[in-house]
């Protein structure tokens, strides 16, 4: 027998690892769809008039080649000890948390917990986070995270404006706030017509403002009591916001004790690496009467169908996708995974451990300050926690350079001062090197006292709930983390077919580099020459994204898709202002648009005009034409999603763009559905002027159970000068364009959550241009295969002119309402089959939107189809009168182990209820709770850890 080498490429990441169906399976699927080839399907799906002609042509890297390239790039970053502070600090990530949370797909591949029955684990972890924040800030209600401290401050400003009874239109900002926070607040305030007054608290005139923001401790270190300032604000019917530090609050008097209405900050130093700017979970807490005005997601306690304790997202009618143009915030993706990490850091250390860390950080700072003073240095402030500034006069540059020579970054403050912020990684050796940079060779004193007045010492306890007391041993921590993850359904268990969410594979090789210290320990404001590796990676990713989208420049700053929308609209408005067209403020948005679109437009100060949908789901072209003409020289932009939110490539997209440009507007193409376009259609080539990209959808960043995400924006060349800038960076922040942007920032850090950009870069490098295009084609195949398999059982609501859907399809479940079966019933019944429900009731109420992505195998898709077909038969039984809807397995879903072992008095067999067709028997996923009562949870709102008795009841 002669030897013939195989043509099988074992290292073909795109086709062997990322794309689910094999070539032979694709042939079967194409037959079901009714086409002879993938090329024919694409021709029938994507209009020829918009298809790109130039293919993406870079070669792919194998996984081992990718990791070698990453090592080379990582080596170009210089790992220094950064004592710059300014909201970013060195921290120790406990290996138990890194291994069991950050590196665990059970945690990082989950979706936002809108289906509470399959998200009890991460909901409990987020409730722990809320409890931690509420306890430490001394305020009763906290949310489940925001994007970063600066945007949290901006959200707090608009929240204060809504809630304040003052008629003033100005907001006071303490000059001791972090510079990036002040800049982001100015960016947010300008389009809303809010005047920002920056000054010393002594200059505050409470009657002139609706609210004020104080930094505690201040950016230059000052710790002071704001009780009197806050009382004066309240006397004038204004609200007080305190930006604070959770570690400092383990020692310092809490904002709630000062009378603060809102507290915000970052939980980064609770075990989350700096990552050159992120991702990190910001927090917000508030007084009870403000909770309904709070942005972001809020976890609450409710009960299930059997009366057992259950967690859920509370007060969801506050959210942007429901309120749309009436929304007060566009927060969607936040930072759930990082909030979970921070909550486990608190569980890991407990209150005594956190206080010990805070004491060590503070006393080390006192030692350093004392040594500097004894050597004759002028150190301020008198009261501090972990940050001091030293007056050095003309010697500033020399001291900064001497510190860098010793491996330490200090902060340049003005022209003649140096800032020093210590953290939990600071030891005696670091202090000695700092002193050496100042020419001081005497050791710091061993015994010192408090560095702030005793009245500022915290008097109240915190983290008294047993969850923060019971898990000291790592074995117990590991088991607690495992118990919580076992309660959830993430991509490591099953397909998550959420329409418009693109729950694709997050490959292990893509994830690995983010935990490397060469990427994790960099401070976002470190000298640029220390981040050469980051700049190479970010620049290369930006260039590739420009090639993919057809845009000329790419800003990597926005921290989420919604923030990308906001940044893109601000860019458009800045462009119009520069041309003398400041009156252009109208934004045309189709009624079917993503909920964040009108919310973002409202935040940007635009007037939203809603455009109708035609009967086939497309934008109503006549209505669009009429409203564009009516807007005339006041038209700023239109926002469209492509392919449409109805899952179709609309033939008229070029005409929509032409009409908008004809009236002087700019075209914003929402990139949420880019997974149907990569390699096939470039939004910048079909008339788009700006788009955001959801890197946590199309480009493989995991959803993390509700964040992190990234939403960079691509623009045509004429908009590039108006992209977001940053106060800490000079020079260009964009890829593909050499001009420095001078508009205000939208995020705290110059490149947003820079460390997770590495995931998308790795994805692009391993897939290669051809692999990225094939992924798009297979995503379209998988969606059309599902539509074909379900035809006859469910009506597919919208299709293109040739009967095809894009990368997702909408199943119409409204006809079943006549029999009393709801879309909720179908969603919960899918849990019994081990599936997360598709997107419910959006963009059309009473429907399910299904997006399988290219990563799902034919076997998994067939299992999902079998589940839906079995559910259709159960609906048919209700329709034909065999069983009432209220008595059916649909209404009792999901079924728990408690249901399985209880006395069975239901009108369908136990086997049918608990083991429906398509479900696994050996490895079956059992939801920990039955159907959750949402209304009960909102009527009886509890947003911190419930009493310990409820845990023991649940255990029994």
UniProtKB/Swiss-Prot annotation:
It comes from the Bacteria. GO terms for biological process: glycine decarboxylation via glycine cleavage system. It catalyses: N(6)-[(R)-lipoyl]-L-lysyl-[glycine-cleavage complex H protein] + glycine + H(+) = N(6)-[(R)-S(8)-aminomethyldihydrolipoyl]-L-lysyl-[glycine-cleavage complex H protein] + CO2. InterPro entries: GcvP, GDC-P_C, GDC-P_N, GDC_P, PyrdxlP-dep_Trfase, PyrdxlP-dep_Trfase_major, PyrdxlP-dep_Trfase_small. One of its GO terms (cellular component) is glycine cleavage complex. Signal peptide: none annotated. The glycine cleavage system is composed of four proteins: P, T, L and H. This is Glycine dehydrogenase (decarboxylating). It comes from Cereibacter sphaeroides (strain ATCC 17023 / DSM 158 / JCM 6121 / CCUG 31486 / LMG 2827 / NBRC 12203 / NCIMB 8253 / ATH 2.4.1.).
């Amino acid at each position: 027998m002669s030897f013939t080498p195989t043509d099988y490429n074992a290292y073909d990441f795109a086709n062997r690892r990322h794309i689910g169906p094999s070539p032979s399976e694709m042939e079967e699927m194409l037959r079901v769809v009714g086409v002879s080839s993938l090329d024919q399907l694409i021709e029938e799906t994507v209009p020829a008039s918009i298809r790109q002609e130039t293919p993406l042509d870079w070669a792919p890297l194998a996984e081992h080649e990718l990791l070698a390239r990453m090592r080379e790039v990582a080596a170009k970053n210089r790992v220094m000890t950064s004592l710059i502070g300014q909201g970013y600090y060195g921290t120790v990530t406990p290996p138990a948390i890194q291994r069991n949370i950050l590196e665990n797909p059970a945690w990082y591949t989950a979706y936002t917990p809108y289906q509470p029955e399959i998200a009890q684990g991460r909901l409990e972890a987020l409730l722990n986070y809320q409890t931690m924040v509420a306890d430490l800030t001394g305020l009763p209600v906290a949310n489940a995270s925001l994007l970063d401290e600066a945007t949290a401050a901006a959200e707090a400003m608009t929240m204060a404006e809504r809630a304040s009874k003052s008629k003033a239109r100005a907001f006071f900002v303490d000059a001791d706030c972090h510079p990036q926070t002040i800049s982001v607040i100015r960016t947010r305030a300008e389009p809303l017509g809010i005047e920002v007054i920056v000054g010393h608290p002594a200059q505050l005139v409470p009657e002139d403002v609706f609210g004020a923001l104080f930094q505690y401790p201040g950016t230059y270190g000052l710790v002071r009591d704001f009780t009197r300032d806050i009382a004066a604000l309240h006397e004038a019917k204004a609200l007080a916001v305190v930006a604070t530090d959770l570690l400092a609050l383990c020692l310092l008097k809490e904002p709630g004790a000062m009378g603060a209405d809102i507290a915000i900050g970052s939980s980064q130093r609770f075990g989350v690496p700096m990552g050159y700017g992120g991702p990190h979970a910001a927090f917000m807490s508030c007084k009870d009467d403000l909770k309904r005005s709070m942005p972001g997601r809020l976890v609450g306690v409710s009960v299930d169908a059997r009366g057992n304790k259950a967690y859920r997202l509370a007060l969801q009618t506050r959210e942007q996708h429901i309120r749309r143009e009436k929304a007060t915030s566009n927060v969607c993706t936040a930072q759930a995974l990082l909030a979970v990490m921070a909550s486990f850091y608190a569980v890991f250390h407990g209150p005594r451990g956190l206080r010990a860390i805070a004491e060590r950080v503070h006393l080390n700072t006192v030692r350093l300050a004392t040594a500097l003073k004894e050597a004759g240095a002028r150190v301020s402030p008198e009261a501090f926690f972990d940050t001091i500034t030293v007056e050095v006069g003309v010697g500033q540059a020399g001291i900064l350079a001497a510190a860098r020579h010793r491996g330490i970054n200090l902060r340049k403050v003005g022209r003649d001062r140096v800032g020093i912020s210590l953290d939990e990684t600071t030891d005696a050796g670091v202090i000695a090197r700092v002193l050496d940079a100042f020419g001081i060779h005497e050791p710091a004193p061993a015994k010192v006292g408090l560095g702030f007045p005793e009245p500022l010492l915290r008097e109240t306890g915190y983290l008294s709930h047993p969850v923060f007391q019971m898990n000291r041993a790592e074995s117990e921590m590991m088991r607690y983390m495992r118990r919580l993850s076992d309660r959830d359904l993430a991509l490591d268990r099953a397909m998550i077919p959420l329409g418009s969410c693109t729950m694709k594979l997050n490959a292990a090789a893509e994830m690995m580099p983010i935990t490397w210290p060469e990427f994790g320990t960099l401070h976002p404001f470190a000298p640029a020459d220390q981040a050469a590796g980051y700049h190479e990676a970010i620049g290369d990713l930006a260039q590739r994204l420009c090639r993919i989208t057809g845009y000329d420049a790419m800003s990597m700053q926005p921290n989420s898709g919604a923030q990308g929308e906001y940044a893109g609209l601000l860019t458009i408005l800045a462009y119009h202002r520069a041309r003398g067209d400041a009156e252009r403020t109208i934004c045309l948005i189709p009624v079917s648009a993503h909920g964040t679109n009108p919310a973002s437009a409202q935040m940007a100060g635009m007037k939203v005009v809603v455009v109708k949908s035609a009967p086939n789901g497309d934008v109503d072209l006549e209505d669009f034409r009429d409203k564009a003409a009516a807007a005339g020289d006041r038209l700023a932009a239109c926002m469209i999603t492509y392919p449409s939110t109805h899952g179709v490539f609309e033939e008229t997209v070029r005409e929509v763009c032409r009409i908008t440009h004809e009236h002087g507007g700019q075209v914003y193409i929402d990139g949420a559905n880019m997974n149907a376009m990569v390699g096939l259609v470039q939004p910048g080539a079909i008339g788009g002027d700006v788009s955001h990209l959801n890197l946590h959808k199309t480009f493989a960043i995991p959803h993390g159970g509700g964040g992190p995400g990234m939403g960079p924006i691509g623009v045509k060349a004429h908009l590039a000068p108006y992209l977001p800038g940053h106060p800490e960076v000079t020079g260009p922040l964009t890829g593909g364009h050499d001009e420095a942007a001078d508009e205000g920032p939208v995020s705290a850090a110059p490149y947003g959550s820079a460390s997770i950009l590495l995931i998308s870069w790795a994805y692009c490098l391993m897939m290669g241009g051809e692999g990225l295009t094939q992924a798009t084609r297979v995503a379209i195949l998988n969606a059309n295969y599902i539509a074909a398999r379900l035809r006859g059982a469910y009506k597919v609501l919208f299709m293109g002119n040739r009967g095809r859907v894009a990368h997702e399809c909408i199943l119409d479940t409204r006809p079943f309402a006549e029999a009393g079966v709801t879309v909720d019933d179908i969603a919960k019944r899918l849990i019994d089959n081990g599936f997360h429900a598709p997107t419910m009731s959006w963009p059309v109420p009473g429907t399910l939107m299904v997006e399988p992505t290219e990563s799902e195998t034919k076997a998994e898709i067939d299992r999902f189809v079998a589940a839906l077909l079995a559910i259709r038969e159960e609906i048919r039984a209700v329709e034909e009168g065999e069983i009432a809807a209220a008595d059916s397995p649909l209404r009792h879903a999901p079924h728990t182990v408690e249901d399985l072992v209880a006395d069975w008095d239901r009108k369908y067999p136990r086997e049918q209820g608990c083991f429906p067709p398509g479900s696994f028997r050996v490895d079956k996923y059992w939801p920990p709770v039955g159907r959750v009562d949402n209304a009960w949870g909102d009527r009886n709102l509890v947003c911190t850890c419930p009493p310990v008795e409820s845990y023991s009841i649940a255990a029994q």
